[in-house]
């Protein structure tokens, strides 16, 4: 057992930080006792409004209803760019570091404004209007941020699709959001490899006849398919466009973006976030969680295809007039010192990454870290999944040299911004704990009957009051949002995560309690993977569960039952893995695929995934009650054949 130590707030950190523990306690109390007063003050302090709101909040969590800053009008791009121009027009807004260490760029706020306005005018010239959906399928290059902000500027709703998703996944997201415009690049570059983005778009669009415009950024100058009249080059269109584009006044509750996340029922959910509340959540958490001060260089290593990239590469930092770093590459290319080299090269002060990356780099040993200085670092963050105490301590002692507090943040695509987190100047740290709630956030633990657990204990993590950046809908299927997040425990937001609360009130996230696997910080629905596997003619049935993985946090373990007449083989296994890669993306390929003559089912035909989870995790002494199975003998057969031995 790893002994948990407590790390008090260092004096130097407390003296520099915006908030100490007394400040936290006072503001937190105000935020839950007088939420309208608190959030009204914050919205005025953090955002510029074209028109004031007439009510801070109203809604009913039992019905999943939340309206924030009703009547207020603002524009996200204006808040992220225009209002900074007078004071910091020549300040660097985006530092871009390419996949190849020889490539980098610095974009000032003035240049950002220029490019965003021109791209916004290009979109308008192609018929994009307020409320239209635009799909962005891009590598990690500055143009991805320009595209998001250009949409926000004219009131279009962007749907960013991670560049690692397959053409089929891209197609499904374009169709679900009814996008008529796609912004992409010829190719992406990642870890020295080229990703055929435009080719993938072409495959996806075979089934998307309504797409009338594809804007293509030239990244590699590789050969790509081209449809005359529909496809336009980004650089040519920008050159011809005006740099004058007024920011559209948007209602606080107007949609800002749709972002697809895995669901336990198979079909990805288009999480809808709105303008005012979302931007306030992103800006406020960015400032206080990362203690961002003028002049700091801030680096979040996420991809903009995930919510972390939305909130903590683009919207939160830019709303605060920050310098934010965008990285095209991967942690181990050209070698395992790359992250630390980038930190030295750009004098990064605040670094935010995922436990998966930390664990992978920890396995490479201390030498790649020690060969760099990292003296600029002040704070280290963790996001995407719980960080195990061993990785936490390595991150703290080796990477941060015991100088840098670790900000272990818990939040989700649906929450829009960080909900449970330490604050650098206020929170003593415990390795592996996300510690305490952010302002206005009221977490509770619920038992199996849905009753709140008092004091220390373990249960389902839920939130019992609305917060500004919460999900507003699932695009095109509002009932699904209610059924998923608000129906399981009426009066609460159901997170899908389990948690433990210790005697100090600190929260420890214990992992998913629903059928979603967290692989390297990517949420993958088990039903999505199962659906992909059963597309193969040889597969009769598939059941997918998660099991522990030293680096990725969780691995995907698939049990596959074949059709009569089909035989297990290495070739078939490779076909199935390729099929999952094609349908979802290579990151969703099972790590283990076990042939299962039959699966453990109840008499009503329900697969007992609990038992499969135990087999996958090799927890064979705690299988629990198998008497309700239609054929209990199935279990021993699966145990005997675990990992196809």
Curated annotation (Swiss-Prot):
<dbReference type="GO" id="GO:0005524">
    <property type="term" value="F:ATP binding"/>
</dbReference>
<dbReference type="InterPro" id="IPR020845">
    <property type="entry name" value="AMP-binding_CS"/>
</dbReference>
<dbReference type="GO" id="GO:0016208">
    <property type="term" value="F:AMP binding"/>
</dbReference>
<feature type="binding site">
    <location>
        <position position="308"/>
    </location>
    <ligand>
        <name>CoA</name>
    </ligand>
</feature>
<protein>
    <recommendedName>
        <fullName>Acetyl-coenzyme A synthetase 2</fullName>
        <ecNumber>6.2.1.1</ecNumber>
    </recommendedName>
</protein>
<dbReference type="InterPro" id="IPR045851">
    <property type="entry name" value="AMP-bd_C_sf"/>
</dbReference>
<dbReference type="GO" id="GO:0003987">
    <property type="term" value="F:acetate-CoA ligase activity"/>
</dbReference>
<feature type="binding site">
    <location>
        <begin position="190"/>
        <end position="193"/>
    </location>
    <ligand>
        <name>CoA</name>
    </ligand>
</feature>
<feature type="modified residue" description="N6-acetyllysine">
    <location>
        <position position="606"/>
    </location>
</feature>
<feature type="binding site">
    <location>
        <position position="512"/>
    </location>
    <ligand>
        <name>ATP</name>
    </ligand>
</feature>
<dbReference type="InterPro" id="IPR032387">
    <property type="entry name" value="ACAS_N"/>
</dbReference>
<keyword id="KW-0547">Nucleotide-binding</keyword>
<dbReference type="Pfam" id="PF00501">
    <property type="entry name" value="AMP-binding"/>
</dbReference>
<feature type="binding site">
    <location>
        <position position="539"/>
    </location>
    <ligand>
        <name>Mg(2+)</name>
    </ligand>
</feature>
<dbReference type="GO" id="GO:0046872">
    <property type="term" value="F:metal ion binding"/>
</dbReference>
<feature type="binding site">
    <location>
        <position position="520"/>
    </location>
    <ligand>
        <name>CoA</name>
    </ligand>
</feature>
<dbReference type="Pfam" id="PF16177">
    <property type="entry name" value="ACAS_N"/>
</dbReference>
<dbReference type="InterPro" id="IPR000873">
    <property type="entry name" value="AMP-dep_synth/lig_dom"/>
</dbReference>
<comment type="function">
    <text>Catalyzes the conversion of acetate into acetyl-CoA (AcCoA), an essential intermediate at the junction of anabolic and catabolic pathways. AcsA undergoes a two-step reaction. In the first half reaction, AcsA combines acetate with ATP to form acetyl-adenylate (AcAMP) intermediate. In the second half reaction, it can then transfer the acetyl group from AcAMP to the sulfhydryl group of CoA, forming the product AcCoA.</text>
</comment>
<dbReference type="GO" id="GO:0005829">
    <property type="term" value="C:cytosol"/>
</dbReference>
<feature type="binding site">
    <location>
        <position position="523"/>
    </location>
    <ligand>
        <name>ATP</name>
    </ligand>
</feature>
<dbReference type="InterPro" id="IPR011904">
    <property type="entry name" value="Ac_CoA_lig"/>
</dbReference>
<feature type="binding site">
    <location>
        <position position="534"/>
    </location>
    <ligand>
        <name>Mg(2+)</name>
    </ligand>
</feature>
<dbReference type="InterPro" id="IPR042099">
    <property type="entry name" value="ANL_N_sf"/>
</dbReference>
<comment type="similarity">
    <text>Belongs to the ATP-dependent AMP-binding enzyme family.</text>
</comment>
<feature type="binding site">
    <location>
        <position position="497"/>
    </location>
    <ligand>
        <name>ATP</name>
    </ligand>
</feature>
<feature type="binding site">
    <location>
        <position position="332"/>
    </location>
    <ligand>
        <name>CoA</name>
    </ligand>
</feature>
<keyword id="KW-0460">Magnesium</keyword>
<keyword id="KW-0007">Acetylation</keyword>
<feature type="binding site">
    <location>
        <position position="536"/>
    </location>
    <ligand>
        <name>Mg(2+)</name>
    </ligand>
</feature>
<keyword id="KW-0479">Metal-binding</keyword>
<dbReference type="Pfam" id="PF13193">
    <property type="entry name" value="AMP-binding_C"/>
</dbReference>
<dbReference type="GO" id="GO:0019427">
    <property type="term" value="P:acetyl-CoA biosynthetic process from acetate"/>
</dbReference>
<dbReference type="InterPro" id="IPR025110">
    <property type="entry name" value="AMP-bd_C"/>
</dbReference>
<keyword id="KW-0067">ATP-binding</keyword>
<feature type="binding site">
    <location>
        <begin position="384"/>
        <end position="386"/>
    </location>
    <ligand>
        <name>ATP</name>
    </ligand>
</feature>
<dbReference type="GO" id="GO:0006085">
    <property type="term" value="P:acetyl-CoA biosynthetic process"/>
</dbReference>
<feature type="binding site">
    <location>
        <begin position="408"/>
        <end position="413"/>
    </location>
    <ligand>
        <name>ATP</name>
    </ligand>
</feature>
<keyword id="KW-0436">Ligase</keyword>
